[in-house]
Amino acid sequence: MRPAAISVILPAYRASSVVATTVARIRSAMPGKEVEIIVVDDGSGDDTDLAASRAGADQVIKLQENRGKGAAVRAGMLNAVGSHFVFTDVDLAYDPSQIPALIDALESGADVALGSRRHPHSSEITSAPALRERGSRIFNQFTRLVLRSSYLDTQCGLKGFTADAAHAIFTRTKVDGFAFDVEVLHLAEKLSLKTTEVPVILDHIEQTTVRFIPQATRMLWDVLKIRMWSALGRYPDLTLRRG
């Protein structure tokens, strides 16, 4: 890979039926760009890893057990070789044509570029179910209260990082589940990284492999753990070293 490569990390769980199409769509969305696609199979137990390899993913990382989206994204980030890293959902709820906007923000000086469904210029093709949308808003309010953060949308599945920022953040993350996004943003604040929010277009696809209530309970508990770890100094050396 050339130094200017864009690394796209796809955490995948039981995604054998969609991963090949996803890999192809990401490549076609950035013609002329050197793109590294990393699929992290989060202990799917099906043929997700084989389908990703056959589709031409540059790296396929297979976790031996289902550890969670946070663990999968971390594994991809720590194995990526590009100068800009992006993670997105394998079901492409955010069309890959939106990735260049994140890269533009990073090249304009941001360390972290956050897709935000709450951005005034964001829109929806297909909305999330009402229960999930309400739950998302409550979770964001809870997160802002517990961590004293200012982010309106922590859980958007489209985020970009410079290589230095990604390394600084993901070598310190501890959360393996869906609340990892909150930990990522908390660490970005603690590391004094420059963040910017980018509008997105959401085309929601319901994830039948996600059990909403148990996951929501775990996410709330993980946010409390992030607060505790931060207060107890469990995150090491919060100093950004730029390459």
Language model segments and positions:
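Acceptor/aglycone-binding surface of glycosyltransferases and processive sugar-polymer synthases
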Residues: 63-79, 84, 96-178, 205-221, ...
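Catalytic donor-sugar/metal-binding loop of nucleotide-sugar-dependent glycosyltransferases
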Residues: 149-150, 172-176, 185-203
